[in-house]
A protein has these predicted regions:
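Conserved RecA-like ASCE P-loop NTPase motor core of nucleic-acid helicases/translocases
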Residues: 1-4, 13
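Conserved helicase C-terminal RecA-like lobe
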Residues: 7, 14-198
Length: 198
């Protein structure tokens, strides 16, 4: 079947997770900063890219460079700084969030803060399809929360328990699987059953 990570909504969320794990991941940065839209336009991102390339910085590092003010208007810099602080705050909180209940609360708040459900419904003409995509998001977040709580379903569907993990540790596993899947390794397609075994 279709890889779980090939679904656009899961790729969107994985971009955010990858950015928490590695802020130098430029493709993840670009997807997260534009999905859902945050008022940071193509021109701003293009100028940021030129600046980052010139100084050999990742896009995220470039956000906080002192000399960025000479390359971008103040309004654009303010929006970029706001995004950067938001990502840093999420990473810090994910590092300190353990257990299924706290992880579920964190993920629910995060999806609300970025307006992801509204984004899905606004970008999808078919409401049933939008609802199905939102259900995929909820299933993915529930799985992450269970992993934080130490619950793992093996491939036979038997629930096993292990030690609790921080949300950032779970994000690291997902980030790795997502990156491998994005590289298009045909014989190693990541499916939901692979996720359950991870």
């Amino acid at each position: 079947g279709q890889s779980f990570f090939d679904r656009a909504e899961i790729r969107d969320l994985c971009a955010w997770l990858r950015l928490w794990v590695n802020s130098d991941d430029d493709p993840a940065f670009l997807r997260a900063v534009t999905t859902p839209k945050r008022g940071i336009g193509h021109t701003t991102l293009q100028q940021l890219g030129v600046f980052a390339s010139k100084y050999r910085l990742s896009l995220f590092e470039a956000l906080f460079a002192n000399s960025l003010g000479a390359a971008l208007p103040q309004r654009a810099i303010s929006s970029l700084h706001e995004f950067g602080r938001f990502v840093n705050d999420l990473e810090y909180r994910a590092r300190h969030t353990e257990g299924a209940e706290d992880a579920q609360r964190f993920l629910t708040d995060w999806l609300r803060d970025i307006g992801y459900e509204r984004h899905l419904y606004d970008s999808e003409d078919n409401e049933k399809l939008a609802a199905a995509r939102w259900n995929n998001v909820l299933e993915f977040c529930q799985w992450m929360a269970q992993r934080c709580g130490g619950q793992i379903d093996d491939t036979a569907g038997v629930t096993m328990t292990s030690e609790k993990k921080s949300l950032l540790e779970v994000a690291q596993t997902i980030s790795l699987l997502s990156t491998l899947n994005e590289r298009g390794d045909e014989q190693n397609v990541v499916t939901l059953s692979t996720l359950h075994a991870a």
